[in-house]
């Protein structure tokens, strides 16, 4: 206890008084009151001065309209919740709709047409104003997954834009402050890529609650922390990784709120003697006394558990865990929350989101540190501004505690980067630097399982760390990918632009040029690419000449290389004979025999690797029997517009299937 108070005091002295208005958004659940006493919590038990925004979870949906989950919520909990604003006039309250148990089917039905979305939006404006809420939070887990069709990814965007438009219109007509709009989103990369257009979400929402927790749990076969701040070499999932992933995909940093869980995830150990991080486990530990959910302990239940448990600190992840017998819990405490809050400030994110306020030690009954010990430290570090600042140490993530972590001692290999060349580091780290790294002084490479710990540093230096990962790709080839570990850096984070496949090396120069090992591909402008041994030249924007062949564009529809016919449908899909060419927007092209897929300007996939691209329009031209006619097979028609109009026309939300098929049939007849 003494160590904690001393440490927190030092953190408060270091807290920068930078004048930045951080958000501290706290969820409150409508089932918190149903827990046994003394864990039963009502809105009246909350401190209205701790959080800048309170979100009531959850409302429901019926017949494409927002509704209360039950009569008690509407008649008792809503009024109590919004009455907190009488004590703190600056407090904002929002109502969240959805949640994990809500599923996806009602969202899908509501999103499916413009008419059903308009019905929902009309009910939302009326419902929020009637009950005194200041905004809506969308908790849709997840568009395009868990039974939700992939079209929901784009219909969800339409809903958000239409909600924003309706909120602005209502504010103008009533002369009241505009209703706020937020969303809870995943922190897992494959879900982010599938479910969201990050750039457009970032433009439309007032703030984004990143669920940077539930990264590990009893559904896995070994122990892992629920919400580590930083990644381990063999496991990139972490709060920092999730936040940087969203930022690097185009979300404004000041709208991104990092998720802080006021709970832990538990495991049942396979062997009592193997009790560290990544120890073998078999399902969840026993349910908590009050939450009664296997694999889960609220923070106040964690406090009771650790009184008789062995506690440890995870180096490089800045979070604690504890075990007792065969029961293991990875949790957060005031110290780990402090590290995470300082990370939010250091990286200039928008603030913190807490799930949930009612799982903190609300009355100070369990943990002995007063009421709301977790949220209180976030309030001190992010909201209050009366503490003077002193400079932070250059590497402040170095608190010595009882620590543990996999891997060996640090084995750094450093190469200087020049300012005018792309530097490929020597074998040993199998790492490479791309143009995006040139803003940094050094790139450090380490072997798998190693850590980088800056030592003896007395003056500011900036490092980026590249880590080798191996995975099996199609065709029994080994794929080596390189990840940049943002947790070891002191400056802005960057994303990986370059990967190696098999024995080849690919170097990305900006977003334009790719070099696979043994071949050189050069982009001329934005339209022309030169693979090794061939030259492809763009004449204007319409005509392409590969080495030895001539390709002529007739209008915008057809291109004829020597002896073959290529058809362009709109601006989206190009189909040469026997090959499939897929264009996502203007970014992704698949030449025959190889796949080069660029998603936005973030990732490059060399030959031999699987690439999952959503919302593609793919067409294949093939010979049919002995006839010389060419049949076109339509595989998918799901390319949405990159930009969404203020009032999108329902006819423009997807390609017109009938017209496209008619064009295809006409082409087949012309042969």
Swiss-Prot record:
UniProt-listed InterPro entries: Chitinase_II/V-like_cat (IPR011583), Chitinase_insertion_sf (IPR029070), Glyco_hydro18_cat (IPR001223), Glycoside_hydrolase_SF (IPR017853), Glycosyl_Hydrlase_18 (IPR050314)
Disulfide bond entries: 26-51
Glycosylated residues (UniProt): 402, 511, 526, 541, 556, 571, 586
Keyword terms: Cytoplasmic vesicle, Disulfide bond, Fertilization, Glycoprotein, Repeat, Signal
GO biological process: carbohydrate metabolic process; chitin catabolic process; single fertilization
Region of interest (8 X 15 AA tandem repeats), residue spans: 490-609
Keyword Signal appears in the UniProt entry: yes
Signal peptide location: 1-21
Tissue: Oviduct.
Protein name: Oviduct-specific glycoprotein
Annotated source species: Mesocricetus auratus
């Amino acid at each position: 206890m003494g160590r904690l108070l001393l440490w927190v005091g030092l953190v408060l002295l270091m807290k920068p008084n930078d004048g930045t208005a951080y958000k501290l958004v706290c969820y409150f659940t409508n089932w918190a009151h149903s827990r046994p006493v003394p864990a039963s919590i009502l809105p009246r038990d909350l401190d209205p001065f701790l959080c800048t925004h309170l979100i009531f979870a959850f409302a429901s949906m019926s017949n494409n309209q927002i509704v209360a989950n039950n009569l008690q919520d509407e008649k008792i909990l809503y009024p109590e919740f919004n009455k907190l604003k009488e004590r703190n006039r600056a407090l904002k309250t929002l109502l969240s709709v959805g949640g994990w148990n809500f599923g996806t089917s009602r969202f899908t039905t509501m999103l499916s047409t413009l008419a059903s979305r308009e019905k929902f939006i009309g009910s939302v404006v009326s419902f929020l104003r009637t009950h005194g809420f200041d905004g809506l939070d969308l908790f849709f887990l997840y568009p395009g997954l868990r039974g939700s069709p992939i079209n929901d990814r784009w219909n969800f965007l339409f809903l958000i834009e239409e909600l924003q438009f309706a909120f602005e219109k209502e504010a103008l007509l009533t002369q009241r402050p505009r209703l706020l709009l937020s969303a809870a989103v995943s922190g897992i990369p494959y879900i982010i890529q599938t479910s969201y257009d990050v750039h457009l979400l970032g433009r439309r929402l007032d703030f984004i609650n990143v669920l940077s927790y539930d990264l590990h749990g009893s559904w896995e076969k070994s122990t892992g922390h629920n919400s580590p701040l930083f990644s381990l070499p063999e496991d990139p999932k972490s709060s920092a990784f999730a936040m940087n992933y969203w930022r690097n995909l185009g979300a404004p940093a000041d709208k991104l709120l990092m998720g802080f869980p006021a709970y832990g995830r538990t495991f049942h150990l396979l062997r009592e003697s193997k009790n560290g991080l990544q120890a073998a486990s078999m399902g969840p530990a026993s349910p908590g006394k009050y939450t009664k959910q296997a694999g889960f302990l609220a923070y106040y239940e964690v406090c009771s558990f650790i009184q008789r448990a062995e506690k440890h600190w995870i180096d490089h992840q800045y979070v604690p865990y504890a075990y007792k017998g065969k029961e293991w819990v990875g949790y957060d405490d005031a110290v780990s929350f402090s590290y995470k809050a300082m990370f939010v400030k250091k990286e200039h994110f928008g603030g913190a989101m807490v799930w949930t306020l009612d799982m903190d030690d609300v009355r100070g009954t369990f943990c002995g540190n007063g009421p709301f010990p977790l949220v209180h430290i976030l309030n001190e570090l992010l909201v209050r501004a009366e503490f003077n600042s002193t400079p932070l140490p250059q590497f402040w993530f170095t608190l010595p505690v009882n620590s543990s972590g996999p891997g060996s001692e640090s084995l750094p290999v450093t190469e200087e980067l020049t300012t005018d060349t792309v530097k490929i580091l020597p074998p040993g780290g199998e790492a490479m630097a791309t143009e995006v790294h040139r803003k940094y002084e050094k790139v450090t490479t380490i072997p798998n399982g190693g850590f980088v710990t800056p030592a003896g540093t007395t003056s500011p230096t900036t490092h980026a760390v590249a880590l080798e990962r191996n995975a099996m790709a199609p065709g029994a080839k080994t794929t080596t990918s390189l990840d940049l570990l943002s947790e070891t850096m002191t400056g802005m984070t960057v994303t990986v632009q370059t990967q190696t496949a098999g024995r080849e090396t690919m170097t990305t120069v900006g977003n334009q040029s790719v070099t696979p090992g043994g071949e050189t591909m050069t982009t001329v402008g934005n339209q022309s690419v030169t693979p090794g041994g061939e030259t492809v030249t763009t004449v204007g924007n319409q005509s392409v000449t590969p080495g030895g062949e001539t390709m002529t564009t007739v209008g915008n529809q057809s291109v004829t290389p020597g002896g073959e016919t290529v058809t362009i449908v709109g601006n989206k899909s190009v189909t040469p004979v026997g090959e499939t060419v897929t264009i996502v927007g203007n970014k992704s092209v698949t030449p025959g025999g190889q796949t080069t897929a660029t998603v936005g300007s973030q990732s490059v996939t060399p030959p031999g690797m699987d690439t999952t691209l959503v919302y593609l329009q793919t067409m294949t031209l093939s010979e049919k029997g002995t006839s010389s006619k060419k049949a076109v097979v339509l595989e998918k028609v799901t390319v949405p517009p990159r930009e969404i109009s203020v009032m999108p026309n329902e006819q423009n939300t997807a390609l017109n299937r009938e017209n496209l098929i008619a064009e295809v049939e006409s082409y087949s007849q012309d042969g």
